[in-house]
Curated annotation (Swiss-Prot):
It is found in: Virion membrane. Belongs to the lyssavirus glycoprotein family. Residues 481-524 are intravirion. Residues 20-459 are virion surface. The chain crosses the membrane at residues 460-480. This is Glycoprotein. One of its GO terms (cellular component) is membrane. Its main location: virion. InterPro entries: PH_Rhabdo_glycop, Rhabdo_glycop_CD, Rhabdo_glycop_FD. The gene is G.
Length: 524
């Protein structure tokens, strides 16, 4: 029995608030007490507010938020960062060209960013070519600077749309907020001076497809509408509702934090700026179905307790606790004073923490002050314990409240480099590290030879150099051939000291050169 009570309180709490769960209901307005007979006891109907007299139920259609609308209001965009790559060249006397690359930032224009984004999305090679380093120019004995502008597109960069004022929220914005995209303002500034944010969709249209039409039953009394039974079967009271626009659509914010758009006859005040609406997701719908089932089950338990009272003709504090109104709204409160059964009209409110109703020992806070007890008895089964502590049977559900809060899920969006809180920007207009991964490496290089001549002069010089080289090679080969010829003759006629015979002009064999000379002189 106790686990079912805890589950009910927990499920009921989830559907009635956003953030911390309400764990109890207690009157914030309590009328005068009057004695009654046990036959006047009744179980509250938590699905329809009978006390307002709106018992006429008629089908109608209304508009509410789509399931998961908070996660659906995402505006996809991109960031555009301007980068200037500078190539500085110096050509020395012998013609060596030294090139040094540097990068700086510049603030881009929205039109140029839109064009670069379209290039990137379409796979246009012009985008990749725009990221290349500039082709350096150089002149002999001069320093020449060549610059090239590039636009770094980083996508996606997802922002959250505030449906109340249509502003955009992201860590990439200064103060994490941008006033929004309009016809006159097509971009948002970022926390980097040389980067702007733009939406993927160039049309300045707010993506507010967050509403859906639902069917329910209107609870009315003549022309007065007190509330309605929603599509899940849970009654929603219009008491305390205020007017609130979401994405330009006028609707009502109910006391439980839900938002609906429906026709009402009465005048309703506007909501203050701090009044927000609750999340609407599949989990809340599922829990609301479970809440309806639990409300029906709790009504059956209340009827069982009431039957026991009628049968035994006796009333206990624990049995009276079953007659408490379980949802905010009008109801009855019961107690026993001096063995007399008492009843009072009450308007119940939700309690999110026990400190709201038990601020100090022995104090049960009702209507802004400590409610007096009669011999340790309050109402609805609430009593004062022997140690002067207020005893509430459902207080043990607070242990499960902490457990349920741990089960709340959160969505971690893509971390844009500008949204990283650890990012530290450099001083001046020096290029940041987050753009380097999108650009070619810059390095210092020595390449090329330049003698200060025009292009045709370079070709003439190269041709002349080639011809001179050929002449030098030919001359060298000729010199080497001439140098080798005398050496070979000396080896042929010098001999090694032995006799060498030659033939004279007369055909006579002469044993040596000297004999040949002698013979010649004799003949003469």
């Amino acid at each position: 029995m106790v686990p079912q009570v805890l589950l009910f309180v927990l499920l009921l709490g989830f559907s009635l608030c956003f953030g911390k769960f309400p764990i109890y209901t207690i009157p914030d307005e309590l009328g005068p007490w009057s004695p009654i007979d046990i036959h006047h006891l009744s179980c509250p109907n938590n699905l329809v507010v009978e006390d307002e007299g709106c018992t006429n139920l008629s089908e109608f259609s209304y508009m509410e938020l789509k399931v998961g609308y908070i996660s659906a209001i995402k505006v996809n965009g991109f960031t555009c960062t301007g980068v200037v790559t500078e190539a500085e060249t110096y050509t020395n006397f012998v013609g060596y060209v030294t090139t040094t690359f540097k990068r700086k930032h510049f603030r881009p224009t929205p039109d140029a960013c839109r064009a670069a984004y379209n290039w990137k999305m379409a796979g246009d090679p012009r985008y990749e070519e725009s990221l290349h380093n500039p082709y350096p120019d150089y002149h002999w004995l001069r320093t020449v600077r060549t610059t090239k502008e590039s636009l770094i597109i980083i996508s996606p960069s997802v922002t959250d749309l505030d449906p109340y004022d249509k502003s955009l929220h992201s860590r990439v914005f200064p103060g994490r907020k941008c006033s929004g995209i309009t016809v006159s303002s097509t971009y948002c500034s970022t926390n980097h001076d040389y980067t702007i944010w733009m939406p993927e969709n160039p049309r300045p249209r707010t993506p507010c497809d967050i509403f859906t039409n639902s069917r329910g039953k209107r609870a009315s009394n003549g022309n007065k509408t007190c509330g309605f039974v929603d599509e899940r079967g849970l009654y929603k009271s219009l008491k305390g509702a205020c007017r609130l626009k979401l994405c330009g659509v006028l609707g009502l914010r109910l006391m439980d934090g839900t938002w609906v758009a429906m026709q009402t006859s009465g005048e309703t005040k506007w909501c203050p700026p701090d009044q927000l609406v609750n999340l609407h997701d599949f989990r809340s719908d599922e829990i609301e179905h479970l809440v309806v089932e639990e409300l029906v089950k709790k009504r059956e338990e209340c009827l069982d307790a009431l039957e026991s009272i009628m049968t035994t003709k006796s009333v206990s504090f624990r049995r009276l606790s079953h007659l408490r109104k379980l949802v905010p709204g009008f109801g009855k409160a019961y107690t026993i004073f001096n063995k007399t059964l008492m009843e009072a009209d009450a308007h119940y409110k939700s309690v999110r923490t026990w400190n709201e109703i038990i601020p100090s020992k022995g104090c049960l806070k009702v209507g802004g002050r400590c409610h007096p007890h009669v011999n340790g008895v309050f109402f609805n089964g609430l009593i004062l314990g022997p140690d002067d502590h207020v005893l509430i049977p459902e207080m043990q559900s607070s242990l499960l409240q902490q457990h349920m809060e741990l089960l709340e899920s959160s969505v971690i969006p893509l971390m844009h480099p500008l949204a990283d809180p650890s990012t530290v920007f450099k001083e001046g207009d020096e290029a940041e590290d987050f753009v380097e991964v999108h650009l070619p490496d810059v390095y210092k290089q020595i390449s090329g030879v330049d003698l200060g001549l025009p292009n045709w002069g370079k070709y003439v010089l190269m041709t002349a150099g080639a011809m001179i080289g050929l002449v030098l090679i030919f001359s060298l080969m000729t010199w080497c051939r001439r140098a080798n010829r005398p050496e070979s003759k000396q080896r042929s006629f010098g001999g090694t000291g032995g006799n060498v015979s030659v033939t004279s002009q007369s055909g006579k064999v002469i044993p040596s050169w000297e004999s040949y000379k002698s013979g010649g002189e004799i003949r003469l």
